[in-house]
Amino acid sequence: MSSIALGVNIDHIATLRNARNTEYPDLVEIANIAVNNGADFITVHLREDRRHIRDSDVFRLKDNLNVPLNLEIAAIDEMLAIAIAVQPECVCLVPEKRQELTTEGGLDVKNMFTYLMPFITQLHNHNIKVTLFVEPDINQINYAKKLSVDNIELHTGVYCNHNTQNELNRILEAAKHCYTNKIECHAGHGLDYQSAATIARVPYISALNIGHFLICEAVLHGIGTSIYKMKKVITNPL
């Protein structure tokens, strides 16, 4: 099988930093360690409440990375302006609720279609690729196709929480549907070594986004070691 890309989300490095409002750990330093150990791109989620990643983090990462920056944002005007100023290689549009601990599900592309169209057009006009974070649902992918997005990221959280064949089948079918419609397919949310190995075997998925689990593993084994192991797991799944 072809090599699958690993995106490392470093949001919770910022969570650790912000716990004491210090300047350490430094996100750029951590991002470079991630890249040196197999990360193909770096992902950060700039939330409306700035609970972890700050505006300045995004600009610093863009200026200091030698791999693509994948910026996750809510589809609101404030974030659009920041994305255009930063010029990340890719923006991933995600749903966002202030009270949630983490992103709880995919975008409802069907109901947001009219709103998303000019938003995506503006990003494309600034040569920024666009990903939509969606449930593994054929109907949602069909609407995403009409928006001419570059990528779909399939929400793997339900599969990771319940590990059912039915949910895995949904991911398989959604990835195949992306391929049929010439949309690059990524996946992420809740992945650990075991679930990432399974999802990495799904045909037509070209990249995985993994964050919280890797940061937790880093507490025990170090960030470099944890990312190196994950890259090995997903590129050589049994």
From Swiss-Prot:
Q: Which UniProt keywords apply?
A: Cytoplasm, Pyridoxine biosynthesis, Transferase
Which pairs are disulfide-linked? none
Q: What CDD domains does the record point to? A: PNPsynthase
Q: Which reaction does it catalyse?
A: 3-amino-2-oxopropyl phosphate + 1-deoxy-D-xylulose 5-phosphate = pyridoxine 5'-phosphate + phosphate + 2 H2O + H(+)
Give the subcellular location: Cytoplasm
Residues recorded as binding 1-deoxy-D-xylulose 5-phosphate, renumbered to this chain, are D11, H12, R47, H52, T102
Q: What is its EC number?
A: 2.6.99.2
One BP annotation, GO: pyridoxine biosynthetic process
In the UniProt record, which is one GO cellular component term?
A: cytosol
Pfam families from the entry? PdxJ
Active site per the UniProt annotation: H45 (proton acceptor), E72 (proton acceptor), H189 (proton donor)
Molecular function terms from GO: pyridoxine 5'-phosphate synthase activity
Q: Gene3D superfamilies under this entry? A: Aldolase class I (3.20.20.70)
- Asked if the keyword Cytoplasm belongs to this entry, the reply reads yes
Cleaved signal peptide residues: none
Tell me the function of this protein.
Answer: Catalyzes the complicated ring closure reaction between the two acyclic compounds 1-deoxy-D-xylulose-5-phosphate (DXP) and 3-amino-2-oxopropyl phosphate (1-amino-acetone-3-phosphate or AAP) to form pyridoxine 5'-phosphate (PNP) and inorganic phosphate.
Its quaternary organisation is: Homooctamer; tetramer of dimers.
Q: What is this protein called?
A: Pyridoxine 5'-phosphate synthase
